[in-house]
UniProtKB/Swiss-Prot annotation:
<feature type="active site" description="Cysteine persulfide intermediate">
    <location>
        <position position="17"/>
    </location>
</feature>
<comment type="similarity">
    <text>Belongs to the sulfur carrier protein TusA family.</text>
</comment>
<dbReference type="InterPro" id="IPR036868">
    <property type="entry name" value="TusA-like_sf"/>
</dbReference>
<dbReference type="InterPro" id="IPR001455">
    <property type="entry name" value="TusA-like"/>
</dbReference>
<dbReference type="Pfam" id="PF01206">
    <property type="entry name" value="TusA"/>
</dbReference>
<dbReference type="GO" id="GO:0006974">
    <property type="term" value="P:DNA damage response"/>
</dbReference>
<dbReference type="InterPro" id="IPR049570">
    <property type="entry name" value="YedF"/>
</dbReference>
<protein>
    <recommendedName>
        <fullName>Putative sulfur carrier protein YedF</fullName>
    </recommendedName>
</protein>
Amino acid sequence: MKNIVPDYRLDMVGEPCPYPAVATLEAMPQLKKGEILEVVSDCPQSINNIPLDARNHGYTVLDIQQDGPTIRYLIQK
């Protein structure tokens, strides 16, 4: 995947689930169509919650990268 530069970053490292998913869904409506939010989380359950919730709300999950316990999501409105 080419190098995508997000418009905004939401750092949820250290926050327990479901807060990363909830915060992602609260942040997304503030973006303009086409803008990208980077979400960083170390909650293991977020790998299931964040992509599913984003898709269910009509957002596009562009990329998911895991580096040790940290998971990085790129979500486009």
